[in-house]
Amino acid sequence: MNVGISVPLPAYFVDVGFMARKVEELGFESFWCAEHPFIPVHSKSRFPGAADGVIPESYRHFIDPFVALARASGTTSRIKLGTGIVLVPERHPLLLAKEISTLDLFSGGRFLFGIGAGWLREETELMGGDFDHRWTQVRESILAMKELWTKTEAEFHGKYYDFPPVYSYPKPAQKPHPPVILGGGAKNVLQRVVAWGDGWLPNRITPDELRQSRATLDRLAREAGRDPSSITISVHGQPADRDLIHRLLDAGANRVIVRPATVKSEAEMGAELTRIAETVLR
């Protein structure tokens, strides 16, 4: 049973190296980190995860996912290491491609590239992203990175990113590249997954909704000439509810990612992860 663990917020109370090692020892399948480089003090954007739209105070306390996963890779040897998610419009593909390929190489091909376009307009725009066309920008960035990962001499010419032939090394351990897993529940997300992705990373979704989405995703894949089984679904941000996890897996999820409670010490985190393992894995 593929169950992953994500880092709770605030994300720096417990060493992620310790946490990832414990996750692996307990038999979980993957370890996930998310990102927001900052949260604006003044924002008109509504938080999509709350009825009142208020951004939680905990969202001020993310860590850099690539530094965190590099730390986690050094204390583990088997578990997958995922971003859940990286805000692609806020990073340049020439640098992002190298960060990913380096992490994938040094981790032995264990990286899962969970991506998103973001919901916080002020953040996206301060980082140079085009918020109103952010998924168009994400697509272009991914296509550019695929060139960098797979070509000896890579070049790309688009609206947002334009570069002449360059050498970009190292290449990732996974071939042709780490899986690109699209987050979110936007209207066209499943079409995007089939067109240029390798998986889907939904959050707020019920087993019935997932079953319908899996059927749609499989149909779109067949219509595009792709093997439906090559496209994964990873359900993010779930409670440690064994019955719910089984229903999500039965509905078509390939993995379910559980978020532990926030704790402030390694001893507390070890106990929390053990509790989750005994609840959902045993």
Locations of regions flagged by a protein language model:
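Active-site-adjacent structural elements that line small-molecule/cofactor binding pockets in enzymes
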Residues: 1-282
